[in-house]
Amino acid sequence: YVEGIQDGIADSPEKMKRYLDTIHTKAEVIDDLVNNLSVFSKLELSRLTFEFKEGDINLFMRDFVDDYRLDLEKNSIKLETDIPTDEVIVRMDYEKMSRVFSNLIDNAVKYRSEDNPTLSVSTMCSDGGVYVNISDNGIGIEENELKNVFEGFYRVDSSRSIKGSGLGLGIAKQIVEKHGGKIWLKSDGLGKGTTAVVFLPKI
């Protein structure tokens, strides 16, 4: 596309915009891949440092979701939240867990339904910890693929037409496990949405 611009093939404003949009999209994919590869390799070699602090996960999630509201509105995605005001203290690295939840919300946005797209975020205390659920009503995942989604570079068949490195969930899993927690996905199948669940132990 760059060569096309240099060679004068983009001979109209509309074609130029199309070329530039494509270049921008591909650059974002490359940047995402390089960034994820860096984090993934550090995690694999146990070189990624963590700075754990005690904090209220409910307050953290309310603030975190608020930061996404404008982007969700721009994409005409309905946001539903059920995050109690009760204080729930966990020990976490705020930057690393922000990366985890960003990845999960970005996935929910990327794989959203074309018809009335909805994103739901909730927290619930049980089993000595807190469950954070991030759900969409999008393309869903077949049951036989759920066990593979956290492997590095794995892409489910239904998502391969959508840009992504296939590293995000693998990184999220390793980060959550460093917190003594667990992460998994649930789906009733293709076209029935997906729920990402993160469990973190309470203090």
Task: Identify the meaning behind each predicted range.
Residues A108-V109:
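Short helix-loop "hinge" at the ATP-lid/N-box region of the Bergerat-fold HATPase_c
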Residues G181-K182:
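Conserved glycine-rich
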Residues I141-F153:
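Short conserved segment of the HATPase_c
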Residues L45-F50, I89-M92:
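Conserved micro-motifs of the catalytic ATP-binding
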Residues E51-E54, E73, K78-V88:
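Conserved catalytic submotifs in the C-terminal HATPase_c
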Residues G168, A172:
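Short alpha-helical Gxxx[C/S/T] motif in the catalytic ATP-binding
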Residues T25-I30:
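Short alpha-helical segment of the dimerization/phosphotransfer core of two-component systems
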